[in-house]
Amino acid sequence: MKQPQIPVKMLTTLTILMVFLCIGSYLLSPKWQAVRAEYQRQRDPLHQFASQQNPEAQLQALQDKIRANPQNSEQWALLGEYYLWQNDYSNSLLAYRQALQLRGENAELYAALATVLYYQASQHMTAQTRAMIDKALALDSNEITALMLLASDAFMQANYAQAIELWQKVMDLNSPRINRTQLVESINMAKLLQRRSD
């Protein structure tokens, strides 16, 4: 008895359809999504600099350290910095104030508080922000964060001469905390804008 022959075209079509179904189901699987995400992460030129922890894990780690040693002002300051980077200004202020209470008068902490207040006020210099800067500079006339905040505000207010003077002062300190290239660029930009406004 002769079996019916399946046409070659139909076999080819079924084979191609099966291949597409297999590829399609793989592309829709969570494994493919993970492979694709990792590929994109590897292609990011800054992936080596990215934090290995997600923000929630960083927060949890900081909170655990504080619970273990609640008198550690440095950990409270790091928590304030974490919240600042998350744009959570009220919690940042609370953490920095706790660090200040534990450490006592400290120029860096006053400058950090000024920074939070400045960004909380949408980059406007308020009386409270200025008071924190003044306290920081009274304790350390070369406090970099306070000077940088004053320079940035002067630049935002189109007071380019003052911005240049402050940035130059910061650069002359030769602190490892500063990015000299960025400072030079800021000074050059202020000089350019100053010439245009004259």
Swiss-Prot record:
Extent of the TPR repeats: 73-106, 144-177
Domain of life assignment: Bacteria
Keywords: Repeat, TPR repeat
Gene3D superfamilies for the chain: Tetratricopeptide repeat domain
Any one of the GO CC terms: plasma membrane
Pfam families, per the entry: TPR_CcmH_CycH
UniProt cross-references to PROSITE patterns, sorted A to Z: TPR, TPR_REGION
Role, per record: Required for formate-dependent nitrite reduction. Not required for the biosynthesis of any of the c-type cytochromes nor for the secretion of the periplasmic cytochromes.
Name of the protein this chain belongs to: Formate-dependent nitrite reductase complex subunit NrfG
Source organism: Escherichia coli O157:H7
Phylogenetic classification of the source organism: Bacteria, Pseudomonadati, Pseudomonadota, Gammaproteobacteria, Enterobacterales
